[in-house]
Structure formats: structure tokens, C-alpha cells
Amino acid sequence: LRAIVLRGNIRNSEEKSSPNPAAAALELIPNNNEMESKPVCFEIEFYEEDGEDHKFKIHYELEVDLGTFLEEEHQRKILAEVLEVNGERVFERTQDLKIENLKVIKDYLSDITEQNADSVNEIAKNSLNQEELFLTNGFKLIFSPKFTKLIVDWFTNKFMVIYRADSMQLIKRFADPKKKAIYVEKTTDEAAKLFGINSNAVGYVVSDDEPDAKLYSVFKNMKNKKTTAVAADIFESYGTIRFINMFPLVIKAMQTGGILVVDEFDASIHPMALMSIINVFHNDDVNIHHAQLIFNTHNPIFLNSNLFRRDEIKFVERGDDTHDSVLYALSDFGTTGDKGVRKHEDYMSKYFISQYGAIKDIDFTPIFEEILCDEKEG
């Protein structure tokens, strides 16, 4: 959804800026087990403010026809698009277009909209393109470039999605950098030292042949007191490098009140470091801008009532035959009955006896027995 909103259409993108290939090649999104095309639905609700007098709860829905899995030649089209602000519907786009309550964003409307409401609505209907979002095209151009910018800026700067965090690399650029100089960022370096780096410090070095700064481990030679830098991926652990790459995004989320969505959050990073980050998000004295952290994990250690409320813990159960995934919360089980979930229970032990679902028995023994049998027969 983020990639679609930022480019303003449901066509494929030539720019592979995300490690998630489905963000650029939308034919990868539909369920690969479906024989016929089914609508793909996206929905998001978030809060944004523009000064003390303009605070908004923004709800956006998008329903699209992308064809079947890997169907590149399918004629794609937008089936529905809805924008609501503070509970009021601003527009609804289906086969037709309804412009509804614009008063909720009256301070953001263009002058031409207020003066020529009827004619502007007709122009907007005629501007619809089945592959282009009305939000970032007709609505932006005709009704409110300022409010559209508010939404797009939120998607750009405050909705941070890290796909495949295990392979993430942070690219640093500096204005007018000096070649071979070492740039040490104090906050990141202090966090890295708490995490447990093997060197004296970590910093970024710009080489002669590459514009992007690379992460280096910094040492002081105890004999001659000179500073030496070695590429961090040679000296530091995989988990340390992952932590250093991710930590600036945690800082950005806290500073902006953004949403940080992380795939494979716990890969190669010590659970105590991750729990400290989680506790920072829960700390109202530190998280004054109400930033959010959303992550997936295979590690049941996070099934902990001291870390998360029951409604904050979600499970995903995938059907082996249909490949459909069902998302549900721990709080959906209620607090009574055989499967009721009470505060301060041992969620992890209950999960391992399949009380909450989203777990399957895996036994590789038959595979190895077959290998041994083949070796004996050979």
C-alpha cells in the first residue's frame, strides 16, 4: 500500500527501491492458489497533526483488481477508493465518484473548489483513470494539494516499513564529505556500545570511488595512539551490524511519532536488546510523540504479559490447502472458558500446547529415515 500511494497508480514500477519485490511487481500480490481473479483490499487508519489546531484521524481504503498470481498482462483497475477524515467521508470512488463532506478539511481546500463546487465535481469525475489513485491525482490537483501532501508526507516519512530486516543495510550520505574521514554519530555509537561492539567505536567512512558512506569499526592503536578503521562486516558480529542499521530508524520513529513496521525484527539480535527497544515504545515519558512498533517474529519469547497486552499480540494461521492467512488477536479468546486467556498467564506454554493455534507439528524424522534407507540399499 505504501508503494502504491507514493507512486499514485497500480502499474508496476521500474524502480526496485524496496527489497520487497511485490511493491514494484503487483502481480506477486494475489494468492497463488486462486484460479480466478479476486479483489485485493488495502486499508489503513492513522493519526496526523498539522499544528495544534489541525489534528486528524485519517482512514484510507483501496480495493483493486490485479488479476491472478503472476498475471502480468491483466487489465488492472481500481474497484473502490475511500477517504475519511475524523469519521467523516470526504470521497468515495467506485464506478462513479461521490464527493461528500469537504468541510472537515475546509482549511486545506483550494480556492477554485470553494467557488465552483458543482463544476469542479464534474471535472473530477471525468478525470478518473482506472489505474490511477484519485487521492494523489484528481483530488490532489482539483480539491486539496495541501491535504494530499499531508497524507503523502506521512506515508513517506512516518510510515517506515522494513522488509527483510535480516538483510537491511543503512545507506548514509553526508553533505560535502571528506574522503577517508571517519564520521562517528554520537547517539548510534553510544547505543552500539551498550549493545556490545567489539571495537572502540563505529563510524562511517566515505571512500574515493563510492559516494555512499559505509559502516566501519574504529580502533585506537595502543602503541602509537593512531586511529584505524576496519570495515564493520569484517570485524563486528552480524547481529551488531543489524542493530546499528536499525537503530536510527527507531530514533526517527520516536522523534516523529511514526510507525515502524519490521519484518524479522528479532533475527540475530539479542532478545534483551529487543525488549529494551519495546519498553522504550511503551514508556510514555520517552515516547512523547506516540510512535508505534509493529513486528513479526517466530520467537515465542515475546508471548509475555509483562511486555504486551492481549490485544497487542496477534497470530497468523495459514491454511495448508488454501494458502489463506487468518489474523486474530490473543484477546479474541476472551477471559472465560477452557480457552480463555487471563492476565499474567504463561502465554508461551499455552501456545506450545496449541491452545491459541498458529502452530503446527513439524517432524523431519521420516526424511532422514528415507535417506538412511536409500544409503543402505545403495
Residue ranges and their predicted role:
Residues 162-235, 355-362, 366, 371-378:
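Extended helical coiled-coil dimerization/tether regions that scaffold
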Residues 44-53, 83-85, 219-225, 318-320:
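Short acidic, glycine-rich loop/turn motifs
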Residues 1-9, 216-357:
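Switch/communication elements of ASCE P-loop NTPase nucleotide-binding domains
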Residues 48, 64-68, 206, 317-320:
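Short, low-complexity Ser/Thr-rich regulatory SLiMs
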Residues 31-38, 205-213, 319-320:
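Short, ordered beta-strand-loop transition motifs
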Residues 43-47, 61-65, 82, 218, ...:
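Residue-level recognition of well-ordered beta-strand positions that form the cores
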Residues 50-202:
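Electropositive, glycine-dotted interaction segments
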Residues 1-57:
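Conserved P-loop NTP-binding catalytic core
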